[in-house]
Amino acid sequence: MQQLQNVIETAFERRADITPANVDTVTREAINHVIDLLDTGALRVAEKIDGQWVTHQWLKKAVLLSFRINDNQVMEGAETRYYDKVPMKFAGYDEARFQREGFRVVPPATVRKGAFIARNTVLMPSYVNIGAFVDEGTMVDTWATVGSCAQIGKNVHLSGGVGIGGVLEPLQANPTIIEDNCFVGARSEVVEGVIVEEGSVISMGVFIGQSTRIYDRETGEIHYGRVPAGSVVVSGNLPSKDGSYSLYCAVIVKKVDAKTRGKVGINELLRTID
């Protein structure tokens, strides 16, 4: 694996000079091998090690390099044709392979090669970009987007129109992460490498980036870039120091544990915020 990483790191340093016409065989094979490993879930751009999320920057570099070594090509899709550098994940799938891998794909859901989809996942008409990891039992609902290299945990529900930010455009240092057993409400956006920790509930229409203030009304604490585990979050505003205006924030209205979540439905958690 170290040899593979060395090839990627070396190629990335000269990425501006690499084209589909001049890329050498060793570099091309290394990049394609990494994309295959990401595609099967054997490698992840980010993973939790000893309780901390670690981003493997060299894998992200391989994803970026894949755009340098491939020309656009015509792709067939139902009644539509596409023209892009990255092939579709399911282009070569037959019924037996879909059954073996154990997830559902509702047309016209789109997944790029290099994204991993785990068993018992349901993809409604949605979009999953290259390098993303979607773990078991997750629902990606209609018009939701899982950005490049984003990490989605087990038993997550991404509601209709949710946007989970990627790392490629604009270039971000770390991927956005939604941990296990989270619910993200319709039309919410979580971007710029924000981590939503396990068991959190994000209400409809909440927007969280690295600069968004995440206000805990019980403690008065303000978080940036991280939603603490078990948080129930709604959109809100905080006043300026002189009270002349207010600015958007996300508000943690309560904390819940796994036992409470098991007894109370998501809608009930969001309704009883007082």
UniProtKB/Swiss-Prot annotation:
Signal peptide: none
InterPro entries: DapD_Trfase_Hexpep_rpt_fam, Hexapep, Hexapep_transf_CS, THP_succinylTrfase_dom1, THP_succinylTrfase_N_sf, Trimer_LpxA-like_sf
Main location: cytoplasm
GO CC, alphabetical: cytoplasm
Residues spanning the membrane: none
Family, as annotated: Belongs to the transferase hexapeptide repeat family.
Record-linked NCBIfam families: dapD (TIGR00965), PRK11830.1 (NF008808)
HAMAP family for this protein: DapD
Name of this protein: 2,3,4,5-tetrahydropyridine-2,6-dicarboxylate N-succinyltransferase
Record organism: Yersinia enterocolitica serotype O:8 / biotype 1B (strain NCTC 13174 / 8081)
